């Protein structure tokens, strides 16, 4: 027992069913770094990344940039890739975001503050986009991408 609660990348977790079940049934998180894993060729094809299996089998996951300076990417790019490649639902996107707070290294009191603030902001966001004019409202939200998003994903933000 190493005492870890967060596992970086976790690409090979699928190869050990006992470990996968322990990750699911205990308080562990897998940090998912899709762009890094693609560029480092940790997976032969990003469509084969185990992330959606982990997420949908109940293993706590969060999205991360890994090394945004090295890969010229940001969190927007990571979320875009996750949604585009794995057809994430809104609930799945929210779950990965909540996990980021729940498994952070912050003190418990700060975690609670951050989660409460996130829930508040998320409620406001959802109310803005729940109406019939959600496309107009969304068009006004500034999104930022770096070179990876522009070049690899062909985003024009």
What are these regions (language model features)?
Residues 24, 55-56:
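Anion (oxyanion) recognition and catalysis
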Residues 87-157:
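Mid-to-C-terminal alpha-helical segments outside catalytic/metal-binding sites
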Residues 10-14, 41-45, 69-70, 84, ...:
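Alpha-helix capping and helix-loop boundary segments enriched in small/acidic/polar residues
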Residues 1-41:
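Active-site core of metal-dependent hydrolases
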Residues 59-74:
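Short acidic/histidine-rich active-site segments
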Residues 78-84:
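A short alpha/beta connector and helix-capping loop motif
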Residues 71-77, 91-92:
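Short acidic alpha-helix initiation/capping motifs at coil-to-helix transition points
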Residues 44-52, 78:
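Charged helix-capping and loop-helix junction motifs
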């Amino acid at each position: 027992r190493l005492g870890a609660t967060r596992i970086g990348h976790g690409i090979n977790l699928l190869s050990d069913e006992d470990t996968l079940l322990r990750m699911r049934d205990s308080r562990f998180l897998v940090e998912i770094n899709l762009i890094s894993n693609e560029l480092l060729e940790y997976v032969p094809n990003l469509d084969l990344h185990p992330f959606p299996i982990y997420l949908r089998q109940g293993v706590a996951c969060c999205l991360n940039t890994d090394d945004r300076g090295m890969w010229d990417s940001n969190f927007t790019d990571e979320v875009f890739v996750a949604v585009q490649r794995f057809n994430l639902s809104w609930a799945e996107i929210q779950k990965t975001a909540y996990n980021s707070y729940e498994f952070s290294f912050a003190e418990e009191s700060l975690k609670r503050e951050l989660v409460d603030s996130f829930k508040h902001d998320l409620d406001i966001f959802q109310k803005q986009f729940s109406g019939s004019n959600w496309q107009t409202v969304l068009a006004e939200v500034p999104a930022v991408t770096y070179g990876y998003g522009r070049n690899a994903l062909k985003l024009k933000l």
